[in-house]
């Protein structure tokens, strides 16, 4: 009886492996997220929202939804390599050791999301923000944001999507670009631009972007 039970258990295991391999071979499970990737995705959503919409609170969490995959992966790499300043609340153990494949899985997941933006910026500044975004500030040698981020702020490649980004987060990033992201790959372009913008111009840009979808 013991021999029969052992034989049966071994047969069950072999069949399970065979079916698993068959599923992989025909591609039926190719797009299923791996368990570790799924847990990372859920971890991100704990702070950035179930739809990646960001979080308004004492610690503002940026919108990740719809972000360009290349930019998303670059930022995860920057955190891991410490070329982007890390806020104290980030659990870096979750970023260090993250494989390129896992970064790609996270980027793919969030790039496909597009919930409605929170808005929240002063509406009377939206028109001014739109003008700066589309035309720049020539007298301050500030180019149009749209030149790199796209006419609708959707981003492309390594240039971030800005549409729908949380109002306070955009303000914080533009104000603190040099101190927090001085080693960023885009710093040579963005740091001088951010420094050339006045506080009122930064607020107007952030207001405009907060309503874009």
Predicted segments — roles?
Residues 56-63, 78-121, 156-161, 180-213:
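Axial heme c-ligation environment in periplasmic c-type cytochrome domains
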Residues 1-11:
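Bacterial N-terminal signal peptides that target proteins for export
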Residues 32-82, 86:
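The feature marks the first
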Residues 117-165:
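Surface-exposed interaction/gating patches
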Residues 9-20:
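Bacterial N-terminal signal peptides
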Residues 23-41, 53-60, 111-138:
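Electrostatic cytochrome c docking/interface patches
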Residues 66-69, 75, 160, 165-166, ...:
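Extracellular/lumenal glycan-associated surfaces
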Residues 42-50, 106, 142-152, 205:
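The canonical Cys-X-X-Cys-His
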């Amino acid at each position: 009886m013991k021999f029969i039970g052992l034989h049966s258990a071994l047969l069950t295991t072999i069949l399970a492996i065979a079916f698993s391999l068959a599923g992989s071979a025909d591609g039926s499970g190719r797009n299923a997220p791996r368990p570790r990737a799924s847990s990372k995705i859920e971890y991100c959503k704990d702070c950035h929202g179930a739809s990646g919409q960001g979080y308004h609170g004492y610690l503002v969490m940026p919108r990740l939804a719809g972000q360009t995959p290349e930019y998303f992966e670059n930022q995860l790499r920057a955190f891991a390599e410490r070329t982007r300043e890390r806020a104290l609340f980030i659990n870096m153990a979750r970023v260090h050791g993250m494989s390129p494949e896992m970064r790609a899985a996270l980027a793919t997941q969030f790039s496909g999301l597009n919930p409605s933006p929170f808005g929240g910026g002063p509406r009377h500044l939206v028109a001014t923000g739109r003008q700066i975004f589309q035309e720049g500030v020539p007298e301050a040698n500030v180019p149009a944001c749209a030149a790199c981020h796209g006419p609708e702020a959707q981003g492309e490649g390594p240039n971030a999507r800005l549409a729908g980004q949380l109002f306070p987060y955009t303000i914080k990033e533009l104000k603190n670009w040099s101190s927090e992201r001085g080693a960023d790959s885009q710093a040579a372009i963005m740091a001088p631009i951010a420094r050339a913008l006045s506080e009122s111009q930064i607020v107007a840009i952030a207001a405009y972007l907060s309503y874009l979808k």
